[in-house]
């Protein structure tokens, strides 16, 4: 059978590449199969917007009263099965959501829903159970020695380790993180056009100001670290300033969706509160671990149930609690991500249809996130948490090597830490799009990651995503909140001057933990915009014609501010 016969014998719902993609394949692989517009190729009628894949594709000649994407009325979306993924082509673009569905589950139907990645559910249950058991043991020890730990900033007898004073400190840290995170999100809605510039300027001013302040007060180690961060941020801002107009268009689109769908704001607010509540529990657990397992001879916590005290046990349990806390906040954040992806996906495909937005899109998406997709979310969160945990261990080892004067070990550990940093960036980068794919199509974690990777490469959207700057801007905003919270923690320690920090030995752990807690709270708040960005680019890569037909003004603005987009989105 020759190439033409194979082409004619293709199943009706097979993927038929458009001419642009076909030409790319011919150039790259020498693929010479004939492209026959009569058998399913792209055929453009100059008199009307008409896209008809005659072998089971979609058509748009009937736009409806809203002028949006209406899909093909002959398609059976409830029974339609996605084609198998192959390394040669991305997932079939003809497998599309139903824009005229009344509910989210109908619009993004999963033919045979099942609990994906069950191993992720087991891991989540084990980690949560372990963290809960540890928390109960140590908090009970704190309660039993509460009079020794004190009732306020100065009332305790504990002058050797963290106590009630530290809990009050973290209360201020969490309040700072919550307020600034919500204000930052509100600023994105109120001053959308200026938001990216405001973020960069505030981040630069605050990072340089914090670095200079630390140097002035003699906290040189933190000052040097913040100077490095500030210098890198300045360099990044200078290199990316020309891409700000394109990023502004994308951000305006995302904010407009939040205005039209108040559920996004509600989810963000609830997520911030949940993140802050977990941060309270986490900080209480960390302080209580010191209360229970600090090996000081005066520690009454050693006499409570839960085992004896030792320095090794203290360090080990602190590391375990930090890993569990980071992992659980990642799960919380990514559940919100998947939930909001459902809302943005519904907007992209359905808001301009005759039916309009599906009913209860947020609630239906949340239900899918905490049932069928929870294992996938847990598995993806675990990978990121392990990488970050290893990075933190390497950072501690590097500091020890530097203090001991071992230059070779310091350099090697720095190199390994940089490698893990790149790995962390890559995994986090593709996790965003994998979670959006999971939200819309109900697939497992690994198939979703593979599909999004191939889809981004095929369309060339990966470079477009990098140039959008949205992820970087939101990361800078979260860092700004974390800097502010860390500064609050440092000032609280410095000016209240607790006896346990008389030698300054607790500056690093207390301030560092404050930074991490505030960063996670801010990331949870900002995930609604990050989720919207990843869902927008995922849908754009998969179905660019929907944007061109349903939202022509947005499409033209994107092409105007980012000229390569027209070639990348060749439809």
From Swiss-Prot:
It is a multi-pass membrane protein. One of its GO terms (cellular component) is membrane. GO terms for biological process: transmembrane transport. Residues 1-118, 188-189, 233-263, 333-369, 428-472, 525-571 are cytoplasmic. Residues 1-96 are annotated as: Disordered. It is found in: Cell membrane. The keyword Protease does not apply. The keyword Nucleus does not apply. Residues 15-31 have a biased composition (Polar residues). Signal peptide: none annotated. The chain crosses the membrane at residues 119-139, 167-187, 190-210, 212-232, 264-284, 312-332, 370-390, 407-427, 473-493, 504-524. Residues 140-166, 211, 285-311, 391-406, 494-503 are extracellular. Keywords: Cell membrane, Membrane, Transmembrane, Transmembrane helix, Transport. Residues 39-52, 71-80 have a biased composition (Low complexity). GO terms for molecular function: transmembrane transporter activity. InterPro entries: Choline_transptr-like (IPR007603). Residues 81-90 have a biased composition (Pro residues). It comes from the Eukaryota. Probably involved in transport through the plasma membrane. Belongs to the CTL (choline transporter-like) family. PANTHER family: CHOLINE TRANSPORTER-LIKE (SLC FAMILY 44), PROTEIN PNS1. This is Protein PNS1. It comes from Yarrowia lipolytica (strain CLIB 122 / E 150) (Yeast).
């Amino acid at each position: 059978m020759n190439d033409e016969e194979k082409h004619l014998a293709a199943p009706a719902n097979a993927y038929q590449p458009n001419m642009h993609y076909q030409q790319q394949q011919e150039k790259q692989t020498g693929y010479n199969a004939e492209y026959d517009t009569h058998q399913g190729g792209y055929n453009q009628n100059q008199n009307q917007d008409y896209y008809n894949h005659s072998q089971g594709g979609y058509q748009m000649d009937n736009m409806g009263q809203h002028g949006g994407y209406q899909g093909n009325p002959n398609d059976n979306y409830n029974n339609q099965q996605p084609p198998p993924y192959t390394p040669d082509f991305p997932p079939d673009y003809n497998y599309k959501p139903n824009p005229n569905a009344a509910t989210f589950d109908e619009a993004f139907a999963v033919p045979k829903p099942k609990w994906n990645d069950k191993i992720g559910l087991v891991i989540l249950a084990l980690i949560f159970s372990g963290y809960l058991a540890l928390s109960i043991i140590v908090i009970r020890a704190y309660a039993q020695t509460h009079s020794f730990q004190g009732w306020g900033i100065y009332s305790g007898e504990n002058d050797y380790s963290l106590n009630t004073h530290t809990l009050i400190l973290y209360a201020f840290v969490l309040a700072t993180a919550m307020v600034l995170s919500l204000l930052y999100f509100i600023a994105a809605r109120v001053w959308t056009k200026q938001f990216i510039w405001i973020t960069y300027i505030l981040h630069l001013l605050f990072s340089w100001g914090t670095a200079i302040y630390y140097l002035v007060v003699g906290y040189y180690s933190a000052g040097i670290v913040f100077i490095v961060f500030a210098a890198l941020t300045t360099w990044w801002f200078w290199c990316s300033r020309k891409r700000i107009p394109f990023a502004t268009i994308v951000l305006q689109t995302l904010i407009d969706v939040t205005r039209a769908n108040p559920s996004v704001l509600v989810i963000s607010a609830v997520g911030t509160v949940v993140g802050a509540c977990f941060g309270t529990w986490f900080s209480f657990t960390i302080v209580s671990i010191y209360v229970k397992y600090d090996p000081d001879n005066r520690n009454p916590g050693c006499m409570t149930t839960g085992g004896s005290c030792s320095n090794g046990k203290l360090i080990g349990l602190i590391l375990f609690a930090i890993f569990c806390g980071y992992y659980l906040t990642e799960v919380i954040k990514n559940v919100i991500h998947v939930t909001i992806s459902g809302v943005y996906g519904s907007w992209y495909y359905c808001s301009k249809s005759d039916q309009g937005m599906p009913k209860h899109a947020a609630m239906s998406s949340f239900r899918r996130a905490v049932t069928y997709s929870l294992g996938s979310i847990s598995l993806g969160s675990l990978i990121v948490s392990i990488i970050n945990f290893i990075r933190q261990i390497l950072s501690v080892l590097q500091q020890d090597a530097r203090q001991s004067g071992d230059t070779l070990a310091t350099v090697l550990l720095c190199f390994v830490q940089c490698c893990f940093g790149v790995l962390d960036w890559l995994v986090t980068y593709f996790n965003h799009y994998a979670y959006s794919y999971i939200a819309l199509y109900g697939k497992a974690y690994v198939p979703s990651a593979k599909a999004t990777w191939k889809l981004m490469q095929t369309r060339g959207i990966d470079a477009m995503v990098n140039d959008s700057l949205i992820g970087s801007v939101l990361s800078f905003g979260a860092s700004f909140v974390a800097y502010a919270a860390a500064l609050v923690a440092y000032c609280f320690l410095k000016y209240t001057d607790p006896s346990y920090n008389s030698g300054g030995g607790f500056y690093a752990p207390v301030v560092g933990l404050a930074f991490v807690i505030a960063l996670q709270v801010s990331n949870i708040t900002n995930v609604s915009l990050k989720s919207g960005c990843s869902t927008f680019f995922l849908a754009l890569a998969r179905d660019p014609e929907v944007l061109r037909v349903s939202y022509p003004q947005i499409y033209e603005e994107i092409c105007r501010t980012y000229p390569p987009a027209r070639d990348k989105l060749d439809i």
